[in-house]
C-alpha cells in the first residue's frame, strides 16, 4: 500500500516511456533519404514484376484464344455524358422510330386487351363463366 501511495507522490512511472515514444514519432517524419530511395526502388521493382507477370498471363490467354478460336470480349464504350446520369439513356433517332419502350411492347403482347373497356367487360363476364363451368362439372358428378 505504501508503494501505491508513493507512486502517486513521485509521479507517473510511465511518463518516461511516453516521452521516448513521442521522440520516436518525431524521428519517423524525417526519414533518411537513402531509406526513402530504397523504398521507392523496391516499389518500382514490385510494380515491374507484376507488370511482367500480367504480360505473360495475357500472352497465355491469347494463345488459348487462338487455339480454341475464341474472340476477345470487348466492352462497349459508353458515352461520357452518361457517366453521372441518374435516369435512363436517351433514345437514338432509330430507336425512337422503331417504336419506343421495349417494356411497353412486351406488356401489350402478353394477352391483355389494348383498351380498358374490353378488360372491364371480360372481368364482368368472368363470374358467369365460372358459374356455368362449375354447374357443368357438378352435373357430370354423381354423389352417392
Swiss-Prot record:
Gene Ontology terms for molecular function: syntaxin binding
Disordered: annotated span: 1-119
Tissue distribution of the protein: Expressed in a subset of neurons in the central nervous system, including large serotoninergic Retzius neurons and pressure-sensitive P cells.
Source species, domain of life: Eukaryota
Annotated SUPFAM superfamilies: SNARE fusion complex
Gly residues: compositionally biased ranges: 1-10
Coiled-coil region: 29-67
Polar residues: bias regions: 103-112
Subcellular location(s) of the protein: Membrane
Modification Cysteine methyl ester occurs at: 141
Keywords on record: Coiled coil, Exocytosis, Lipoprotein, Membrane, Methylation, Neurotransmitter transport, Prenylation, Transport
UniProt topology in membrane: Lipid-anchor
A Pfam family assignment: Synaphin
Compositional bias (Basic and acidic residues): 18-27, 36-86
Propeptide regions on this chain: 142-144
Keyword Cell membrane: no
GO BP annotations listed: regulation of neurotransmitter secretion; synaptic vesicle exocytosis
Chief site of localization: membrane
GO annotation, cellular component aspect: SNARE complex; terminal bouton
Residue numbers with lipid attached (S-farnesyl cysteine): 141
Protein family: Belongs to the complexin/synaphin family.
Function: Positively regulates a late step in synaptic vesicle exocytosis.
Record note on quaternary structure: Binds to the SNARE core complex containing SNAP25, synaptobrevin and syntaxin-1.
Protein name, as recorded: Complexin-1
Amino acid at each position: 500500500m505504501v508503494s501505491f501511495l508513493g507512486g502517486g507522490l513521485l509521479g507517473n512511472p510511465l511518463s518516461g516511456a511516453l516521452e521516448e515514444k513521442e521522440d520516436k514519432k518525431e524521428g519517423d517524419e524525417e526519414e533518411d533519404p537513402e531509406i526513402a530511395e530504397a523504398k521507392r526502388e523496391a516499389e518500382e521493382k514490385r510494380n515491374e514484376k507484376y507488370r511482367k507477370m500480367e504480360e505473360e498471363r495475357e500472352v497465355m490467354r491469347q494463345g488459348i484464344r487462338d487455339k480454341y478460336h475464341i474472340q476477345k470480349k470487348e466492352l462497349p464504350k459508353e458515352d461520357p455524358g452518361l457517366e453521372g446520369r441518374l435516369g435512363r439513356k436517351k433514345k437514338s433517332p432509330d430507336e425512337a422510330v422503331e417504336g419506343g419502350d421495349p417494356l411497353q411492347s412486351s406488356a401489350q403482347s402478353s394477352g391483355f386487351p389494348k383498351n380498358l373497356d374490353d378488360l372491364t367487360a371480360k372481368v364482368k363476364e368472368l363470374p358467369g363463366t365460372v358459374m356455368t363451368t362449375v354447374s357443368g362439372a357438378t352435373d357430370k358428378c354423381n354423389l352417392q
